[in-house]
From Swiss-Prot:
<keyword id="KW-0597">Phosphoprotein</keyword>
<dbReference type="GO" id="GO:0005654">
    <property type="term" value="C:nucleoplasm"/>
</dbReference>
<dbReference type="InterPro" id="IPR044275">
    <property type="entry name" value="KRP"/>
</dbReference>
<keyword id="KW-0539">Nucleus</keyword>
<feature type="region of interest" description="Disordered">
    <location>
        <begin position="55"/>
        <end position="151"/>
    </location>
</feature>
<comment type="similarity">
    <text>Belongs to the CDI family. ICK/KRP subfamily.</text>
</comment>
<dbReference type="GO" id="GO:0001673">
    <property type="term" value="C:male germ cell nucleus"/>
</dbReference>
<feature type="modified residue" description="Phosphothreonine; by KIN10">
    <location>
        <position position="152"/>
    </location>
</feature>
<comment type="subunit">
    <text>Specifically interacts with CDKA-1, but not with CDKB1-1. Interacts with CYCD1-1, CYCD4-1 and RHF1A. Binds to FBL17. Interacts with KIN10. Interacts with CYCD3-1.</text>
</comment>
<feature type="compositionally biased region" description="Low complexity">
    <location>
        <begin position="124"/>
        <end position="139"/>
    </location>
</feature>
<keyword id="KW-0832">Ubl conjugation</keyword>
<dbReference type="GO" id="GO:0004861">
    <property type="term" value="F:cyclin-dependent protein serine/threonine kinase inhibitor activity"/>
</dbReference>
<dbReference type="Pfam" id="PF02234">
    <property type="entry name" value="CDI"/>
</dbReference>
<dbReference type="InterPro" id="IPR044898">
    <property type="entry name" value="CDI_dom_sf"/>
</dbReference>
<feature type="region of interest" description="Disordered">
    <location>
        <begin position="1"/>
        <end position="36"/>
    </location>
</feature>
<dbReference type="GO" id="GO:0045736">
    <property type="term" value="P:negative regulation of cyclin-dependent protein serine/threonine kinase activity"/>
</dbReference>
<dbReference type="InterPro" id="IPR003175">
    <property type="entry name" value="CDI_dom"/>
</dbReference>
Length: 196
């Protein structure tokens, strides 16, 4: 591992963020020219970032979202020579993730507006990939389809008798107060209704 990569790893391990998780991906071969050492920082705040060690052809992944994981955006892209220079010159690279975020030339964004959980498989860890799977909160809330109960004749009769009694109550009100509550009109009779 190069000296700069060691410095980044030491600087990352000495940070003061409360829940900080450091994971090294693709650990299998340091001597291969195609291998990439990637250090991933996961901080539970409103901004989470992972940055690649500064090699000529490596890429970075930046993940930003809310603590509640209700919405999240995932973006990735390759470093440009300018952004590598900014990162090398910055004394707090990897320490203050919110103040020194690196802009990239190519960026792909995906917005997820549901609860999700990040999972990595051994193969995807080697490739530096993280997959997201939707948590099924609706699966736990699903009700088992019940057997439809056919109402008995007595229940049907009770329903219709209630409806008839409501009609009877309306008629009684109309006769007593000479006011049609259905059409909201005064009727001729015992009382005289004046509009206010």
């Amino acid at each position: 591992m190069s000296e700069r990569k060691r410095e980044l790893a030491e600087e990352a391990s000495s940070t003061s963020f409360s829940p900080l998780k450091k994971t090294k991906l693709n650990d299998s071969s340091d001597s291969s020219p195609d291998s990439h050492d990637v250090i991933v920082f996961a901080v539970s705040s409103s901004s989470v970032a992972s940055s690649a060690a500064l090699a000529s052809d490596e890429c970075s992944v930046t993940i930003g979202g809310e603590e509640s994981d209700q919405s999240s955006s995932i973006s990735s892209g390759c470093f440009t020579s300018e952004s590598k220079e900014i990162a090398k010159n910055s004394s707090s690279f990897g320490v203050d993730l919110e103040d020194h975020q690196i802009e990239t030339e190519t960026e792909t964004s995906t917005f997820i507006t549901s609860n999700f959980r990040k999972e990595t498989s051994p193969v995807s860890e080697g490739l530096g990939e993280t997959t997201t799977e939707m948590e099924s909160s609706s699966a736990t809330k699903r009700k088992q389809p019940g057997v439809r109960k056919t109402p008995t004749a007595a229940e049907i009769e009770d329903l219709f008798s209630e409806l008839e009694s409501q009609d009877d109550k309306k008629k009684q009100f109309i006769e007593k107060y000479n006011f049609d509550i259905v059409n909201d009109e005064p009727l001729e009779g015992r009382y005289k209704w004046d509009r206010l």
